[in-house]
């Protein structure tokens, strides 16, 4: 009879241990999922910020180059017109 009680106690302990382990695994899965989700959000934000900065930088460079080219062409045309004007005098 005592052997049967010991076996029953061992089975109960094994069952409780299994349930506790399942609970711990579930808790760890939730934490890992939350951490991965947070890391994904942070990574996406970092990528978006980097792309935005690159776009702004590219826009600024395009604007500067456009202004420089426009200024250079305007100067060249003005210079040519002045030269032609002197030839016509």
Curated annotation (Swiss-Prot):
InterPro entries in UniProt: FAM25
Membership in a protein family: Belongs to the FAM25 family.
Name of the protein: Protein FAM25A
